Amino acid sequence: MREIVCVQAGQCGNQIGSKFWEVISDEHGVDPTGTYQGDSDLQLERINVYFDEATGGRYVPRSVLIDLEPGTMDSVRAGPYGQIFRPDNFIFGQSGAGNNWAKGHYTEGAELIDSVLDVCCKEAESCDCLQGFQICHSLGGGTGSGMGTLLISKLREQYPDRIMMTFSIIPSPKVSDTVVEPYNTTLSVHQLVENSDESMCIDNEALYDICFRTLKLTTPTFGDLNHLVSAVVSGVTCCLRFPGQLNSDLRKLAVNLVPFPRLHFFMMGFAPLTSRGSQQYRGLSVPELTQQMFDAKNMMQAADPRHGRYLTASALFRGRMSTKEVDEQMLNVQNKNSSYFIEWIPNNIKSSVCDIPPKGLKMAVTFIGNNTCIQEMFRRVGEQFTLMFRRKAFLHWYTGEGMDEMEFTEAESNMNDLVSEYQQYQDATIEEEGEFDEEEQY
């Protein structure tokens, strides 16, 4: 029941995805060949959320791996869990998108999309009751952004009532991987606003900061960053996979976190994060976790929650703890920091408790927040977009693939609208809410 199909698009998506499968397989006691080696019935009880059982009791991930060049696929296959995936679920082109959104969305990607949809439908048909799709991709490149958004809109057509959840790696402010990032990101956000139900925004720079500051790693690698992300991804779905006192699923998350349909871009955090050396000096308790969870340094985006206000938030606790204590702490946070929470949504933190903690921890918590400060990120990308678009820099790469300048203008204005919507709800007070209604009546 409640299966999730995981789609990984582009290099970034596949690398995060393969790390994620390592974490999930470890939690469920599945070894790299797909055989169950665990010691607890709880691991098997709902293993079918992410795994399909094949002949001979072998567990196969419900995963679709897409890329427009074969390179990443080879490194996934060569990785520790490379042999666990179904070979038919690797779908790749030969040419690569070359960091070009138009190639991923209109030319190269469009040629592959039918075979990708076939595999996705096969995976969906083997499910009892499909909960939704989870898509890992980056917005700065060509494949993850262009082809990823194309796939999302196609899946939306076929499965209109299923949850579409994306884990989107947003370009970071100081570190840029490609020059045309602002173009690719803006065009992607334009699609995500319309077609996804929940988008978790993650950015590399914030992840680097967490590794460097909190975990005290001197030279963090992409492997370390991806491990952080996969801890959160597994935390979001742990209620589906293990028994809990207070369950949540993707749909409950969406219902509780999205007050207005367009504002579905979330920040994520994870606690406890401590460096190896100082682990034994810290106690794990619900107050301690709550404190770290709301800490700005723990957020996986380069946006400061103190600059905005929380529309809604969700805390997914894992481990043995009293639900009473969880409720008290959540109430406590809201009362003490009431200025950072929107006052016209009372009780805006959803909490859930799952009994099984992650491997090697007694308790942990995953945090998902819908904060208006995420507009900083879109605003930053929008400014970079405008600077380049005003001079029409690099545009010929996109128009050459059949795109129109009009599309760029549309995407830009859609993203600017998103920013101003966030700003509007950040400034709104209870008194003003009444005025909005009155204006509509005349």
Curated annotation (Swiss-Prot):
Superkingdom assignment: Eukaryota
Residues that, per the record, bind GTP: 11, 69, 138, 142-144, 204, 226
Molecular function as annotated in GO: GTP binding; GTPase activity; metal ion binding; structural constituent of cytoskeleton
Binding-site residues for Mg(2+), renumbered to this chain: 69
Family matches, as SMART domains: Tubulin, Tubulin_C
InterPro entries: Beta-tubulin_BS (IPR013838), Beta_tubulin (IPR002453), Tub_FtsZ_C (IPR008280), Tubulin (IPR000217), Tubulin/FtsZ-like_C (IPR037103), Tubulin/FtsZ_2-layer-sand-dom (IPR018316), Tubulin/FtsZ_GTPase_sf (IPR036525), Tubulin_C (IPR023123)
Names of the cofactor(s): Mg(2+)
Compartments, as annotated in UniProt: Cytoplasm, Cytoskeleton
Coiled-coil parts of chain: none
Cysteine pairings via disulfide bonds: none
Family stated for the protein in its record: Belongs to the tubulin family.
Known function: Tubulin is the major constituent of microtubules, a cylinder consisting of laterally associated linear protofilaments composed of alpha- and beta-tubulin heterodimers. Microtubules grow by the addition of GTP-tubulin dimers to the microtubule end, where a stabilizing cap forms. Below the cap, tubulin dimers are in GDP-bound state, owing to GTPase activity of alpha-tubulin.
Quaternary structure annotation from Swiss-Prot or TrEMBL: Dimer of alpha and beta chains. A typical microtubule is a hollow water-filled tube with an outer diameter of 25 nm and an inner diameter of 15 nM. Alpha-beta heterodimers associate head-to-tail to form protofilaments running lengthwise along the microtubule wall with the beta-tubulin subunit facing the microtubule plus end conferring a structural polarity. Microtubules usually have 13 protofilaments but different protofilament numbers can be found in some organisms and specialized cells.
This protein's name: Tubulin beta chain
Source taxonomy: Eukaryota, Discoba, Euglenozoa, Kinetoplastea, Metakinetoplastina
